Amino acid sequence: MSKKNIVLAFSGGLDTSFCIPYLKEQGYAVHTVFADTGGVNEEERDFIEKRAAELGVASHLTVDGGPAIWDGFVKQLVWTGETYQGQYPLLVSDRYLIVDAVLQRADALGTCAVAHGCTGMGNDQVRFDLAIKAQGNYTIIAPIREIQKEHTQTRLYEQKYLEERGFGVRAKQKNYTINENLLGITLSGGEIDKWEAPGEGARGWCAPRSAWPADPLTVAIKFVEGEAVAVDGKPLSGPQILMKLNKLFASYGVGRGIYTGDTVIGLKGRIVYEAPGLTALLTAHRALEDAVLTKQQNRFKPHIARKWVELVYEGFFHDPLKTDLETFLKSSQANVNGEIVLETRGGRVDAVAVRSPHILTSKGVTYAQTADWGIEEAEGFIKLFGMSSTLYAQVNRSLRS
């Protein structure tokens, strides 16, 4: 009797390593997919492939997730110009692209059974499950959630489970839970979870202040219809742009912060995050929009943007409302063309120059300096513009007297 195929989102870590023998003992032929979204080097990719083979998978597939994460998430996030709760730039949104890779593999194998290694306490389980459910009638198996029903020390249980079956466990145990991809890095655990100051080890790409270069960094980013297409005059693919900006701005400590916010399941979450490239892109794009969008566009767009960010954070990546909002966002980018010059001396980044044919200026007019209208026109505008407030004050003064 042939075993039923199941496709597992695999990272090579303890949780997903445990999932393979666990699922095999449930009667499945396990096929693993590793979606490389930019968080590993070639050596780590090789380790993941060998680890899957060691654990006895039926097949293993590595997928380049860089183009998908740019086209499916980064472009739209930059269009919004927003972060979750005004701070966090949605750095684990690669989960949705990982799901896509898993489902494509499942469809190719003709199976509806898929699995992931998410725990039952975090946000990722929500993102994985909702993204899967939105795309078809798939059966979701979550082994870590299953064992958490019976075991409180789940990681110790997983280690023992693997060792009893002859599989080694990496001797080096990390002090922090680290998520790394093209978007950036998040760190949690240890003193971070205890609401204390992060230790020196709680650092990813971003250099500490003592290591910042003495000379300032200046970088020019070109946008076409809201999408970054070149850095310092050199055309690059989206993933290449983000990788380059990550490297440049990380050396100046740009994009690092401590975030405390509301998780999907209602708990408070606290992480250290680093997103140097995204921070640079968002800063540049916002400066260009400020110059080329109308007053009403710049006023209204943040309402749409905040809702889009909330939907993505909370797992509604495939909700029709998200698609509707993206239609508006894409339309708003028609004139977001030009080049922004960014500058950093460390820690923060500023847009210091804007170059675009779409800047909303008028010949002969400079704010607070020169104008092509008369004094009487200005006075008339002020009178009409403030009519409601002026009448309110007049009426209430007369009533009080």
Curated annotation (Swiss-Prot):
GO terms for biological process: argininosuccinate metabolic process; L-arginine biosynthetic process; urea cycle. Transmembrane segments: none annotated. L-citrulline binds at Y88, S93, N123, R127, Y273. It is an enzyme of class 6 (ligase). It comes from the Bacteria. Keywords: Amino-acid biosynthesis, Arginine biosynthesis, ATP-binding, Cytoplasm, Ligase, Nucleotide-binding. Pfam families: Arginosuc_syn_C, Arginosuc_synth. GO terms for molecular function: argininosuccinate synthase activity; ATP binding. ATP binds at A9, F10, S11, G12, G13, L14, D15, T16, S17, A35, G117. Its main location: cytoplasm. L-aspartate binds at T119, N123, D124. Disulfide bonds: none annotated. It catalyses: L-citrulline + L-aspartate + ATP = 2-(N(omega)-L-arginino)succinate + AMP + diphosphate + H(+). Its EC number is 6.3.4.5. Pathway: Amino-acid biosynthesis; L-arginine biosynthesis; L-arginine from L-ornithine and carbamoyl phosphate: step 2/3. One of its GO terms (cellular component) is cytoplasm. It is found in: Cytoplasm. HAMAP family: Arg_succ_synth_type1 (MF_00005). NCBIfam families: argG (TIGR00032), PRK04527.1 (NF003385). Belongs to the argininosuccinate synthase family. Type 1 subfamily. Homotetramer. This is Argininosuccinate synthase.
